[in-house]
């Protein structure tokens, strides 16, 4: 089991566990520099990120805002900016957390796009949804929500000349816990390689409120299961996923779930196949 843990961790470029606060600060500096270099390489000046109210988008948003603030100071170019985007589906049940995230990030600009009308309009036109069991239809529409959110972010980025930031990290990547070409689509993923507790450590060091740092993660895509916890979908806890990624002991059953899920979702982590 240890060898396959190492193989998967290497494939996902998992970062070593943090030993000290200096390790956390080094990762913050590294990821801010990464964001800045992506902007410089692209020739663009704007970053776009959807803010959900969860710790992942909060952390990525804090990194993004710091990145552009430093670029403005270093270069004297005031065109560098970060746009934080709220993308609720009708009324979001944890909207207060999303607003608290925005207040913490203090982005240069905030926009709101309610995806409810677009999702409903598309769902009404899809003959493929007719006759489906309610749970299956709800799942498919949940993925539509994620993809519409990414369409909106890329529309803003296209209009403003920017790059779209993703929030994927190693704990989600190993489980394939993202919508293909939805929240899995982005131009840069500054949280890549981090375990879930490491994302929380960065958020905490960046000044995020503890209630948002330790908030129970949920994709919240399905109407029939509002606020459904990620861990309930995984069948394992984030603590177990993190232990697996760092080559630490964990329940054999949990390790098997993670390995099986990793293989089943491999297609999500690959580019489209070609002849």
From Swiss-Prot:
Pathway stated in the Swiss-Prot or TrEMBL entry: Cofactor biosynthesis; NAD(+) biosynthesis; NAD(+) from deamido-NAD(+) (ammonia route): step 1/1
GO terms (BP aspect): NAD biosynthetic process
Keyword Magnesium: yes
Top-level EC class: ligase
InterPro entries, A to Z: NAD/GMP_synthase, NAD_synthase, NH(3)-dep_NAD(+)_synth, Rossmann-like_a/b/a_fold
GO terms for cellular component: cytoplasm
One Gene Ontology term of the molecular function aspect: glutaminase activity
Reactions it catalyzes: deamido-NAD(+) + NH4(+) + ATP = AMP + diphosphate + NAD(+) + H(+)
Residues the record lists as binding ATP: 50-57, 167, 196, 218
Role according to the record: Catalyzes the ATP-dependent amidation of deamido-NAD to form NAD. Uses ammonia as a nitrogen source.
NCBIfam families in UniProt: nadE (TIGR00552), PRK00768.1 (NF001979)
Protein's name according to its UniProt entry: NH(3)-dependent NAD(+) synthetase
């Amino acid at each position: 089991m240890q060898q396959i843990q190492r193989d998967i961790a290497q494939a996902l470029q998992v970062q070593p566990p943090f030993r000290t606060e200096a390790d956390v600060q080094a990762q913050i500096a590294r990821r801010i520099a990464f964001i800045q270099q992506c902007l410089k390489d692209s020739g663009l000046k704007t970053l776009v990120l959807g803010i959900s109210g969860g710790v992942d988008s909060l952390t990525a948003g804090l990194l993004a805002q710091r990145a552009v603030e430093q670029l403005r100071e270093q270069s004297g170019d005031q065109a560098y900016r970060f746009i934080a985007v709220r993308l609720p589906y009708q009324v979001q049940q944890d909207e207060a957390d999303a607003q608290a995230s925005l207040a913490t990030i203090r982005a240069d600009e905030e926009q709101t796009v309610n995806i409810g009308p677009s999702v409903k309009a598309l769902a009404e036109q899809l003959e493929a949804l007719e006759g489906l069991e309610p749970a299956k239809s709800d799942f498919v529409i949940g993925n539509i929500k994620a993809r519409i959110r990414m369409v909106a972010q890329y529309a803003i980025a296209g209009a403003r000349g920017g790059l779209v930031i993703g929030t994927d990290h190693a704990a989600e990547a190993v489980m394939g816990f993202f919508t293909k070409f939805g929240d899995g689509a982005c131009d840069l993923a500054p949280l890549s390689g981090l375990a879930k507790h490491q994302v929380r450590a960065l958020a905490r060091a960046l000044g995020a409120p503890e209630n948002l740092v330790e908030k129970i993660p949920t994709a919240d895509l399905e109407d029939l299961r509002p606020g459904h916890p990620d861990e309930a979908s995984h069948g394992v806890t984030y603590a177990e996923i993190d232990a697996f990624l760092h080559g630490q002991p964990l329940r054999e059953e949990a390790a098997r779930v993670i390995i099986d899920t990793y293989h089943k979702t491999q297609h999500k982590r690959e580019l489209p196949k070609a002849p």
